[in-house]
Amino acid sequence: MEMKQISETTLKITISMDDLEERGMELKDFLIPQEKTEEFFYSVMDELDLPDNFKDSGMLSFRVTPRKDRLDVFVTKSEINKDINLEDLAEFGDMSQMTPEDFFKSLEQSMREKGDVKAHEKLEKIEEIMEDVVEATLANQSEAADPSTNHESEPLDYVHYVLDFSTITEAVAFAKTIDFSIEASELYKGSNCYHMTILLDVQQQPSYFANVMYARLIEHANPGSKTRAYLQEHGLQLMLDGAVEQLQKIELG
């Protein structure tokens, strides 16, 4: 099993099929809520070295996403009453008529309404990007193996990304996560948030590099709501060059 903290309120636990089998569980056990399922979730939590803010919280909700070779469980420390758990699934009605896909969609919607919505959306965005990367890689390998599919295209030399932050503190925290080379960065102030532009050199990089880097960036930021052109014309320019480097020098209390 693997655990990753996505935000202050959300963990992602990846459980392999072997892990499920060792614990006497199957995917079908998650289709209908039962005491066995909830006990399984909490036994997994007991095995893992949880962050301090999750220990003895008692107010947890679980979102289950089945994959081909694993089970992804998103654990959210909710601000709502700790009694909100799998019993809430009663509101779904007659689940015997639901397909597994319908059930998981209903479960996801319920957790969205009661949990860390932004974290869930960001996770889904990252997962979509990485799935696209895998598909693109396989497609490129297929084209490389078949000369008849090769065609000339003009590769991009640089890519601009725009990221959003609710506060300047979030922007500083993001800057401190940057441990790779960037060509340029700018910081703007909008009407209700901060915007940062990041310029990356993608020359001599594989075609999926831009997507991979974007996925890394939005792990600690929100996808941009404005274009760089819009910010240059309408945004308040705070740092026009080296924004990341300047923010990295700021000490957070």
Swiss-Prot record:
Highest taxon of source: Bacteria
The UniProt entry, under InterPro entries, shows: MecA_C_sf, Neg-reg_MecA
MF (Gene Ontology): protein-macromolecule adaptor activity
Which function does this protein serve?
A: Enables the recognition and targeting of unfolded and aggregated proteins to the ClpC protease or to other proteins involved in proteolysis.
Q: PANTHER family, alphabetically?
A: ADAPTER PROTEIN MECA, ADAPTER PROTEIN MECA 1
Comment, domains? The N-terminal domain probably binds unfolded/aggregated proteins; the C-terminal domain interacts with ClpC.
Complex formation: Homodimer.
What is stated as this protein's family in its record?
A: Belongs to the MecA family.
Official protein name in the record: Adapter protein MecA
